[in-house]
Design a protein with these regions (language model features):
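Patatin-like phospholipase
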Residues: 15-19, 25-114, 149-154, 158-165
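Surface-exposed acidic, glycine-flexible loop patches that form ligand/cofactor-binding
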Residues: 7-10, 41-46, 115-130
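Solvent-exposed loop/turn segments at secondary-structure junctions
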Residues: 22-25, 137-139
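A broadly tuned preference for mixed-charge, low-complexity surface segments
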Residues: 103-117, 176-187
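Active-site gating loop/helix substructures
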Residues: 87, 93, 100, 125-186
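Flexible, membrane-associating and regulatory peripheral segments of lipid-active enzymes
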Residues: 1-18
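Structural motif corresponding to the C-terminal cap of alpha-helices
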Residues: 37-41, 118, 169, 173
């Protein structure tokens, strides 16, 4: 595998970064805003930025954009994901003693919902330069997943987008830690 040649900067010579923060189901609002901007301005959000960075639920939106989806195409699956992954019965952890020692939400349900959207794409399949952070529990340090947009950034291209999505969204208490290439990663 050889990384794609470095893409030229957008017109104007500035390097434009779209940064998407987390917030669980609140990332649905972000996807709606991006979809509305595309509609109102008649632009492609993905094509308006050189790099997209996203953490936690914002990382899920970033990965969706990297998978070639428009913000409008992300909204509907994300709405379904919120209903499936965050059922009303689990929103009150103090009512379930087991949830004092285990994650509130089911990581397998999240993985299944993410697989429906991202399929078997790897980070190397991304149509955009992406940067998705996570926290390496063993090393006690940030772990940043990066597309191979530079000759020295070739480590992560084979990692499935779903695994990266699980790592960046593995918020302690809410979801179990993700295992990616032998590393235990959390949000």
């Amino acid at each position: 595998y050889f990384p794609p040649p470095r893409a030229r900067l957008l017109p104007g010579g500035r390097f434009q970064i779209l940064a998407l923060d987390g917030g669980g189901a609140k990332a649905l609002f972000t996807a709606h805003v991006l979809a509305r901007l595309e509609q109102d301005l008649g632009i492609s959000i993905s094509n308006s930025f050189d790099l997209i960075a996203g953490t936690s639920a914002g990382g899920l939106v970033a990965l969706g954009l990297g998978a070639g989806l428009t913000p409008g195409e992300i909204v509907s699956p994300y709405e379904a994901l919120v209903k499936t992954v965050f059922p009303v019965s689990r929103r009150r952890p103090w009512r379930r003693p087991r949830q004092l020692t285990a994650p509130i939400y089911d990581g397998d349900v999240l993985r299944s919902a993410l697989t429906e959207v991202l399929g078997d794409r790897t980070l190397g399949d991304s149509t955009k330069r992406l940067v998705i952070p996570s926290w390496d529990v063993q090393r006690g340090a940030v772990h940043i997943f990066k597309t191979p947009h530079h000759i020295r950034l070739t480590r992560d291209w084979r990692i499935p987008m779903v695994d990266i999505a699980m790592a960046t969204s593995a918020a302690p208490i809410y979801f179990p830690a993700a295992r990616v290439d032998g590393q235990r990663l959390i949000d």
